[in-house]
């Protein structure tokens, strides 16, 4: 029996595999008719229907025909299925052609939790997923159980398991800064249960900052910059059209504006409960960029997570929850 943690986000797909192996790739894929080659060699092409339909994924998928998830953690959607297949393939789990018994720990936002869990279990649980690789290798995965937790609970469970936070009176607020949304989950730290009325999703994410920086670079160079390059330019200067663009000095004001909008909306939604917050927990890719600002919401309560764990916090917690359920 193999247990993995899987976090299919709108921006990136994260996997915690065997021996804690960590995998991350952009959450996008595209149907392809031919094999392609990149600088590093042949681009991986997968299939989930015996080779009839082939697709590329992650950073290799580009152009006008790319497909992306409908939202975070929507595992039952047809847009997410190739990403799940790619995640399993990338994990390296296989058993010489015979099915591997697999338990998947994953999560989805609290607002649609029951609906998404029901759909995901119907789509994946007790099903054998067959993935064909670029050289015709076939790997099969028997999903014996799918353990789902609300998005954000995964991060809290991981931190609790690591001793970074403790069960205590008060609220823990997980702020997951994603590509398209910022999901806020408030947890009662005594019983680790979500506080539904203080949990919400903001239609604000790092993608807003990327789009703003992309427009700024386009105005400067006269060319539209690829999304991936604009994303990289948020944190460091990059070369584009033989010119150095982006970097902290250029992106700083854009990220400040993003942080201000998120903080203002969180304060508004938490209303008079801020005094009960004992742990603010920024996670997600955006937390690397603006996480330090969240201490303004409840000074002195921000939990510092290792930078390399920020993007994987939910997936780590999902895997832990799946292991505990066995």
Swiss-Prot record:
Binding site for ATP: 10-14, 179, 231, 285-288, 311
Entry keyword annotation includes Heme: no
Gene3D superfamilies noted in UniProt: 3.30.420.40
SUPFAM superfamilies documented for this protein: Actin-like ATPase domain (SSF53067)
Name this polypeptide is given: Archaeal actin homolog
Keyword line: ATP-binding, Nucleotide-binding
Function per UniProt: Polymerizes into bundles of filaments. Polymerization requires NTP and is optimal with ATP, but GTP, UTP, CTP, and even the deoxy form of NTP can also support the polymerization reaction.
